[in-house]
Each structure stands twice: as C-alpha cells, then as structure tokens.
Amino acid sequence: MASKRVAQIAAHLNFPKGMLSGQVAIITGSGQGIGAETARLFANEGAKVVISDIDAAKAQKVADEINAAGGQALAVPGDMLDDAYLGELVKKTAEFGNGKIHIIVNNAGYTWDGVIHKTTDKQWDTIIALHCTAPFKLVRAAAPYFRVKDGEPRNIVNISSTSGIHGNAGQANYALAKAGVTGLTKTIAKEWGPTFGVRANTVAFGFILTRLTAAKEEGAFVTTPDGEKVALGIPQAQKAAREDGSAAFKDIPLGRPGTATEAASAVLAVVSPLFSYVSGQTLSVTGGRNM
C-alpha cells in the first residue's frame, strides 16, 4: 500500500509536458517586467500564452522570443481602457486556444501618484479604471469560456500590491484600486467556484524591481489615452534614502527587493496544480515585509 501511495504522489508531482500543458492564458501587461516573465514561465510549462500590452512592439518581441524558444505565444496589443479591445482580446485568444481560455492574469497597470489633497479627478479615475474596471470587464467578457463544465482547470489571478493591503502615502488612488481587486477576486471565487470549479486568487507584490520602482529620473513613462505622459518610478533622492547604506531595505526581512522572475514564479505557482485547493486568497510576495 505504501509503495502505491508513493507512486500516486509522484504521479501528481510529475508533469512531463509542463504543469500548464494544454491550457490557454491571457496575461495583460505582458510586454515587459513581471507580465513578460509570467508569460515566459507559463510557456515553459506548456501553456499557450497571449501577450496583451499597450505597446505593440514590446508585445510582439515577447511573443517572438517565446515562439523562438519552442513555446506558443500570440501578441494581441491594445489599450485595456478600450472596451472594443477587450472583446477583441477574448475573441483572438479563444481562436488561438481552439475555443478555450483557461487562465486570465490581470497584471496591466501603472501608478500615477499624488498626495490626497493634490490628486486630480483624472489621476483618480484613470487608476481606478485601469486597475479595477478593466479587469472586471475582461473577466466579464471571458465569462463564456470560464462558466463551463469540461473538467479542465480554470484560473483567474488579479495582481495587487501591498499598497492595497496597508495603504501608502501618495497613492490613495492606487491603494483603493488594489484593495478593490481583492473583493473582485473573492466574488469570482464564490460565484464561479461552486458550479464551474473556477479558482480565483490575488497576488500582492511588495518591492519588486520593475520600472515602477526604478528611479523616476531614468525617464520611464506611459501615455494616457488623451496623450498625457505620466512619469513612472520613485524620485532618486527618496530611492537612495531607502536603498543605500547600512539601513538599506531594513523593512524587508530578506533584506532585498524581489526580481520580476520571483514575482512571476508566485503567479505560476497559484495557477498550477500545486495550488489546486486554494481559492479566494491573497498571496503576499514581499520578502516578509509587513508581517
């Protein structure tokens, strides 16, 4: 009996074709950073991945790299704030997946910081629309591919932040948006879990090395739908105060920031069979920060 049990466990942990073999995934904001790393990891585990990003050139580059490495990827660039694009994204993904979609990772987004008394309506509305409304609309558009009973796994991951859990000075808009997606996650889990077996989870990141945590002086920016440029990153003086000297990263028990690959690995774990009984939860990927 013991040997049979060992063989059974080994079979569950051995995925010769990859943990996501046969699955089709949409990953928004996957032209760079955490999203791109998530796409690469998913493809390495056998998934067909759709690269969704507002930057068409970056989306295509990631897709080309995955395909050149033997994976399967399709770039479908567009603006998450455009309802027509969301419909097209779902349509093209279903075609790419032979009528099926198994995974959505709502990762697209950026920060547009400002203290409460100086935050404009435009700053507020844009961040809420991008981080809350757009993920909801994408999930709603993809509902016919998740509300099915075919015995295949379905997963939705909403990306959040410790700003959404603990708040953060200068980020009232972002904090509210990232707190909001956890409510969306739990509602999906409760509505679509019982009948269709859909798992929904939130992954909340701490300090991860991306363009959002680089020095603002490096010049990274995004452009809003009406053409306004929004500078990304942290002012160099503020960044140096936290990261230099003997007190560097003292609020992180592991003593360092995380990499995009480490962040993406957490997303892979959540959608994998290894987390098959986990739903409606928030996984904090912070190096121990905010314990």
Located regions from the model:
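Short C-terminal tail/terminal secondary-structure segment
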Residues: 3-15, 166, 266-269, 279-291
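Canonical Rossmann dinucleotide-binding motif of NAD(H)/NADP(H)-dependent dehydrogenases/reductases
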Residues: 18-50, 188
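Substrate-binding pocket helix/loop in short-chain dehydrogenase/reductase
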Residues: 115-116, 120-128, 248
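Active-site helix of classical SDR
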Residues: 139, 177, 185
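Alpha-helical segment proximal to the catalytic Tyr-Lys
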Residues: 144, 190-194, 276
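Residue(s) in the substrate-gating loop at a strand-loop-helix junction
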Residues: 161
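Short, small/polar-rich loop/turn modules that mediate ligand/substrate recognition or access, typified
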Residues: 194-199, 278-280
